């Protein structure tokens, strides 16, 4: 756990998940970036968390960003689904709110769902409903692109709601039709 996250403990994380389940927060989504040779042996075990808990575990392909990416560590979405299917037949399931580009499935009788995001091997850009806000006030239309819309001028010295709405609309309009992750 620490090798992937660089801080914290799985015990603390599980304590938070348990607390969220106890007070019936919904949806509770767990994102798992799958890496061959690192955590790919835990796919089924993590998916099985949804059997008796109303969790939404989403498996995400490792994206070509940062120091940890290597093509050898990439586990394609279809391979993830094959591994999950070894526990039982998966059926397409309705997506909980905010699942964006995840393809969602469930085992018959399961309390939760599993999702797969083929960030590299499957073009999901047309279904992507995400914008990313940086700590410096820049709104990025695509995780794979450095283009960004600066929101700070619409926030300081006072908030200009009209201008802010225009900037958000501009960012949405700038979302690319296709990312370039597969080429890297």
What are these model-predicted stretches?
Residues 1-60:
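Radical SAM/AdoMet-radical enzyme domain recognition
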Residues 48-52, 62-184:
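Auxiliary Fe-S-binding modules of radical SAM enzymes
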């Amino acid at each position: 756990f620490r090798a992937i996250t660089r801080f914290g403990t799985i015990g603390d994380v599980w304590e938070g998940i348990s607390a969220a389940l106890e007070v019936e927060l919904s949806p509770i989504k767990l994102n798992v970036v799958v890496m061959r040779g690192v955590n790919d042996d835990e796919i089924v075990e993590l998916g099985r968390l949804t059997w008796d808990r109303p969790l939404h575990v989403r498996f995400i392909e490792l994206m070509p960003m940062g120091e940890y990416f290597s093509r050898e560590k990439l586990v394609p979405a279809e391979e993830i689904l094959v591994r999950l299917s070894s526990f039982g037949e998966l059926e397409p399931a309705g997506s909980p709110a905010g699942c964006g580009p995840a393809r969602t499935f469930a085992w018959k009788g399961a309390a939760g769902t599993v999702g797969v995001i083929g960030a590299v091997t499957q073009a999901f850009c047309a279904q992507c409903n995400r914008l990313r806000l940086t700590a410096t006030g820049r709104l990025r239309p695509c995780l794979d692109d450095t283009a960004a819309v600066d929101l700070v001028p619409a926030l300081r010295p006072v908030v200009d709601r009209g201008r802010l709405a225009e900037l958000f609309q501009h960012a949405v309009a700038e979302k690319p039709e296709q990312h370039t992750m597969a080429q890297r």
